[in-house]
Every structure is written in structure tokens, then in C-alpha cells.
């Protein structure tokens, strides 16, 4: 009988939760603002993790790219903080990616609401 969740999925879920906590509690850079960790994809060898984030107060691509640069610069600090937990022997190298799907979804939802209200 196969396991319901593989190791990479468990590690990805753990990283998503811990990174959300660390970004809220430990990172004090005002250039980031409020950030939401949407998803984490971990490579099969657990060496790399792609972290999909959105920013609550930044809708333009320029603002998001600046905040992404700050997050990618802080990736080493976050990786060190994650390594202090004894649950993982090695912590994947983190790479932050802007998740534009949430913003697109919000725009589509606004368009639908506007179309419905015009009828």
C-alpha cells in the first residue's frame, strides 16, 4: 500500500508553515511588507526548494520584484533559522518566486463582479 503523502510533500508542507512563521516573526525588513507563502515545491533530492509568494500591499510587478530580491537575499538567513530545528538533517536551498496567479485571480474576480453588477 502506497503512502498518501511522499517525503517531498511532507517537507514542502513543513517548509511552507515554517517560512510563513519566520517571515512574519523574524524578518523585519519594511521593503517586504506582508508576504504570504502560497506553495513550496521541493526537488526529489531535497536540495532545492522553490517558494511561491505573494505580497499583500504590492500589486505592481516592480514592487514585487524589489521585494523578491530582498527575500532572495534573506534566503541564507532563513535557511539558517530553519536548520536550527532538529527535524531536518539538511535544509534545501531556497529560491523565492512571485506567484502571479493570486493577483490574476483577484482581477478576474473583480471583472466578474463588475459584469454581474452591470446586468
Where are these regions (language model features)?
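Charge-rich, low-complexity N-terminal segments
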Residues: 1-48, 54-119
